[in-house]
Amino acid sequence: MFDLTGKNALITGASGRIGGEIAKALHAAGATVAISGTRLEPLEALAAELGDRVHVLTCNLSDPDAVEALPKAAAEAMGSVNILVNNAGITRDNLFMRMSDDEWNSVLDVNLTATMRLCRGVLRGMMKSRWVAL
């Protein structure tokens, strides 16, 4: 693994297993991590496990205002964001032919639109620091 001492990572979907493991790996490599998700309890448990260099930022990625605020909150908490892990995603357990337009749009809002908005929200700061990892 790389030495990420002094780097700051924002991980979405960190309240789930994959996001939690990503946060653990980046933290173990020396990064400060901002862990984000919709469920506060698993985020707080992960933060307690990691100890220092961790910030809990709840965010519902289906809310455009919350998505816009998340990169700013992460940068304020950590000083900057050098690494963005767009791990969060949703599915609607339904046959495609039965999926409503609203269900389809909610999946796209979280899995695609929020991803683009988060990238856009952190990119300027990453470019200034000349260290970009998306």
Residue ranges and their predicted role:
Residues 52, 73-84, 92, 103:
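A glycine-rich helix->loop->beta "capping" turn
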Residues 29-45:
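Conserved glycine-rich Rossmann-like NAD(P)H-binding loop of the short-chain dehydrogenase/reductase
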Residues 95-96, 103-108:
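Substrate-binding pocket helix/loop in short-chain dehydrogenase/reductase
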Residues 58-70, 101:
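The beta1-alpha1 cofactor-binding region of Rossmann-like NAD(H)/NADP(H)-dependent oxidoreductases
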Residues 8, 15-17:
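Conserved glycine-rich cofactor-binding loop
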Residues 7, 79-81, 126-134:
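Active-site loop of short-chain dehydrogenase/reductase
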Residues 119-120:
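A short, exposed helix-loop element centered on a Lys and neighboring polar residues
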